[in-house]
Amino acid sequence: MIALALLSALLSASDAAQPQTCEPDRALSYICGMDKPEDIIQIPGTRWLIASGFAPGSGLKLVDTRQRSARSWYPPNAGASSPRPFPKCAEAPSAALFNAHGISLRKIGSHRYRLYVVNHGGRESIELFEFSVDSSAAAPVLEWQGCLPLPAGLAGNAVASFADGTVLTTVLTRPGTSIADFMRGQATGGVYQWRPGERSFTLLPGTELPGDNGIETSPDQRHFYVVAFGWHSVVEFDRWTTSKPTRRFIAPGFMPDNIRWFRDGLIAAGMRLYEPTCGGYRKTVNGVADPMLCHRGYSVARLDLDRGIMRVIATGTPEEHFNGVSSAAIIGNTLWLGSYQSDRLAYRPIAPR
């Protein structure tokens, strides 16, 4: 994920360079028309993959991984429940503005899910939706449930939740800090928490890291995990005592972005740390961080929390039509890759896991 301070420049530069073809590259095939699918997540046990759209009006897409097709999943069903369980906002974001960044799912019933979406369109907020899935071939119908506004001056990045309704969101750069700062190892971000009954998000002391990025909670509800982008690491916190991290896992040769629980561990995806065709490591010039528009290779790694090892399970070299790998999902023998820069979702074979 990237800071909003670079967003407009990056979007205009990226849009201008986007190719028109949707033919496969050397190692990747594509579903096009996605408009920066920064974060992706599978609806468990189904063929459906949810993709965010990190651009104004891009919103959400629902991907049929069997048919290799995608459809717009926004605006939501107009007949959703009322009164809404999260009444802070009077109406859902405008479809023309909805800018979906990080996303997260939580099962709240036998066939019922809640979807959390970091939004930058029209307001800085966590938008909440619900939907049901069944055994039929029908696509699930999205229902808006309200929103949780972020404190003034803050832009969310990733989002996660606990089973008791607690919501966590990361902020990459707080006011007065920059991407160049976290590239130097300085603390720039934080994890903010909202609990049912509270009025607003508050900072969890001790979670201020160099570029707080992707976030995930543990199934046992005891820990959460945060990507420190400036450290190229995944950091573990005890949920109840956040004054300092409990563990830190350094990514092998890449810059993890989003993380997601996968079976008994985490998977992380991101661009390669050292890319010869881009002049090596990411740099700052005159205090400004390289926006990484030069196409870099990528890595996907599995973090074994029991053994404390992060091992690369897939990697790729730069591709002509795809850059900015930011998230991954494994469905069967297929690896899906999201991007904060590209106009498409990528997929490729992967050995069974």
Question: What are these regions, as identified by a protein language model?
Answer:
Residues 63-70, 129-140, 237-242, 305-307, ...:
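Short loop/turn segments immediately following beta-strands, especially the blade-tip
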Residues 60-66, 123-135, 184-196, 290-306:
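Beta-propeller blade signature
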Residues 51-57, 117-118, 169-188, 269-295, ...:
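Short, conserved, GDST-rich strand-edge loop motifs in beta-rich repeat architectures
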Residues 324-353:
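Blade-level signature of beta-propeller repeat domains, shared across WD40, Kelch, NHL, RCC1
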Residues 19-20, 49-81, 134-137:
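Beta-propeller domains
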